[in-house]
């Protein structure tokens, strides 16, 4: 029980911080944190909640299938399946899914992946070589959540990573809450920088492979 309360507090603090950046517009997004490994349980945001508010109903505990462990009227976030795929296939400890203008714009500039390089902040992703290059996969959005989940699952590699969903934000996971938040901040910085650079250089015709 002590671990549950500790993880609840940790996830609540992350929610507060991301809220100050307006990364949960219009109740969008969902975040989770692992509570136990065997059996697998994790806390995840309840569906349809205003994340700018802090309430006792912010999170609920679910199992490896995303089913609530305790009796509750709360429903887990619609994209819980993305979280279950990550936790069931890695040793990740925290998953963050947010919608921002920048990460949605990026998914409209590129088709299957976006390549970013030569930025010091890439070191936040535990990539240390000089002038490093990263590739972030982009998958299509699907209203049918199981289809979205299956396409997402194909890109889960390792205990930390990220996947962009076309016009549906980014999902980032890490070894723990600190690692996941650090990675999310790095990706959002890179997206913002990339978009600003393209605007200075004259738009996508001079810098990006436009996706349409």
Swiss-Prot record:
Pfam families cross-referenced by the UniProt entry: Aldolase_II (PF00596)
Cofactor: Zn(2+)
Keyword ATP-binding among UniProt keywords: no
InterPro entries named in the record: Aldolase_II/adducin_N (IPR001303), Aldolase_II/adducin_N_sf (IPR036409), MethylthioRu-1-P_deHdtase_MtnB (IPR017714)
Entry-linked SUPFAM superfamilies: AraD/HMP-PK domain-like
A GO cellular component annotation in the UniProt record: cytoplasm
GO terms of biological process kind: L-methionine salvage from methylthioadenosine
Record keyword Amino-acid biosynthesis present: yes
Matching HAMAP family: Salvage_MtnB
Family according to the record: Belongs to the aldolase class II family. MtnB subfamily.
Role played: Catalyzes the dehydration of methylthioribulose-1-phosphate (MTRu-1-P) into 2,3-diketo-5-methylthiopentyl-1-phosphate (DK-MTP-1-P).
NCBIfam families associated with the record: PRK06754.1, salvage_mtnB
Name of the protein in question: Methylthioribulose-1-phosphate dehydratase
Species assigned in the record: Bacillus cereus (strain ZK / E33L)
Gene: mtnB
């Amino acid at each position: 029980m002590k671990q549950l309360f500790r993880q609840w507090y940790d996830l609540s603090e992350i929610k507060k911080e991301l809220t100050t950046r307006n990364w949960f517009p219009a109740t969008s997004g969902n975040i989770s944190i692992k509570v136990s490994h065997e059996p697998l349980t994790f806390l995840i945001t309840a569906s349809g909640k205003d994340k700018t508010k802090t309430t006792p109903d912010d999170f609920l505990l679910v199992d490896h299938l995303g089913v609530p462990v305790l009796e509750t009227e709360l429903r887990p976030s619609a994209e819980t399946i993305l979280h279950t795929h990550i936790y069931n296939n890695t040793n990740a400890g925290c998953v963050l899914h947010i919608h921002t203008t920048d990460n949605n714009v990026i998914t409209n500039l590129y088709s299957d992946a976006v390549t970013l390089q030569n930025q010091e902040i890439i070191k936040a992703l535990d990539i240390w070589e000089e002038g490093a290059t990263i590739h972030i996969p982009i998958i299509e959005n699907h209203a049918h959540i199981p289809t979205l989940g299956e396409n997402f699952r194909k890109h889960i590699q390792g205990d930390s990573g990220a996947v962009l969903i076309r016009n549906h934000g980014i999902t980032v996971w890490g070894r723990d809450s600190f690692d996941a938040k650090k990675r999310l901040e790095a990706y959002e910085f890179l997206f913002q920088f990339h978009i600003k650079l393209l605007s200075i250089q004259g738009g996508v015709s001079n810098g990006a492979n436009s996706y349409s």
